[in-house]
Regions:
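Cell-envelope and extracellular/periplasmic
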Residues: 20-320
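Bacterial Sec-dependent signal peptides at the C-terminal "C-region" and cleavage site
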Residues: 5-25
Length: 320
């Protein structure tokens, strides 16, 4: 496997998703998806128990039935979940490594035999796959309940480097080392790290120092990720901590402001896109997990729209 550090540059024609090919369609473009439980994915697909899943309100099957045109690309003519042949996902969860073509189920609860949730990766992958002429690999590196302040703490922030910052890069390295085995169709191709998508923030709300340092720590994270992969202009997308929509407490508003401010910090030199997600929150009454506000109440529409926006934000950067 050949590791390529150059960033591919694309032109996307106005009004369509056709992109100029990269230097070679043999190159696998790799996007790192990082964060905590909402990047793991909590959107319910099909579970509809009247007590535990609110009768299926807000699950993927329900929202697809209400708006079939918007979601029609997710299933084939026979009603089976589509599996893309040009976009791939690799995610290690507690059950082990999941690796395969983009479809539902690459989440913290998922396995090859159990696919009942989605995360942002689903529509991120569709956005990138539709825009890029060549194979795409999404490497998910997400763990629930982790803070940027401690767990993902990057080296340039000072102090002890976070365990999950180190594990994030270890997962990427392992994925690239094993790409020929885990994705035989990609065997022998060169790969390049083409973008970084960050969707996190919940745990940093509950520590005064974490709140105050979030903006700076996020800037350090972006700089250090770019340094790790020798790409000072690596495209980066920051997903807003948008749980609950516009109505939010002081601490959540502080994290949101820090995320937005970090995206425009001069030392990053641009090529960072902040994506607001508050508009994608849905009421608990219309969602499967009425007691899980920290997980967007498990609403599949929320996770679909978040992924759509994050993926679209990355495509915007790739146009430059």
């Amino acid at each position: 496997m050949i590791f390529v550090v150059a960033i591919a540059v694309f032109f996307i024609a106005t009004g369509c998703c056709t992109a100029l090919p990269p230097k070679s369609t043999d190159i696998v473009q790799v996007y790192i998806l990082a964060g905590q439980s909402n990047m793991e994915g909590q959107g319910v697909v099909d579970m509809d128990h009247p007590k535990y899943y609110n009768g299926g309100k807000g699950n993927l099957n329900t929202v697809m039935a209400a708006d079939p045109d918007h979601y029609k690309h997710l299933k084939d003519a026979k009603g089976n979940w589509r599996v893309r042949e040009d976009v791939f996902v690799r995610f290690r969860n507690k059950q082990g490594v999941m690796a395969g073509g983009l479809t539902i189920g690459f989440t913290g609860y998922g396995s090859d035999r159990s696919r009942h949730h989605i995360g942002p990766e689903l529509q991120i992958g569709h956005q990138l796959g539709d825009a890029i002429d060549g194979p795409v690999l999404l490497i998910k590196t997400a763990w629930g309940g982790k803070s940027l302040y401690k767990d993902f703490r990057p080296p340039s922030a000072g102090g002890q480097v976070g365990e999950y910052y180190t594990r994030m890069h270890a997962e990427v390295k392992q994925a690239l080392d094993n790409i020929d085995r885990e994705f035989p169709v990609l065997a022998g191709r060169s790969v390049e790290i083409s973008g970084f998508i960050w969707f996190q923030g919940w745990n940093d709300m509950f520590n005064k120092d974490a709140l105050e340092q979030y903006e700076d720590n996020l800037v350090h994270l972006i700089k250090d990720v770019r340094k790790e992969y020798k790409q000072p202009k690596l495209p980066v997308v920051i997903g807003e901590l948008g749980n609950g929509g516009l109505k939010a407490g002081k601490n959540m508003l502080s994290i949101r402001a820090a995320q937005k401010a970090a995206a425009t910090r001069k030392e990053l030199g641009g090529n960072v896109n902040f994506i607001s997600t508050t508009a994608f929150a849905r009421p608990k009454e219309h969602s499967p997990n009425v007691g899980h506000g920290h997980h967007w109440f498990g609403n599949a529409e929320s996770y679909f729209l978040i992924g759509d926006a994050l993926g679209g934000g990355m495509v915007e950067l790739l146009k430059k």
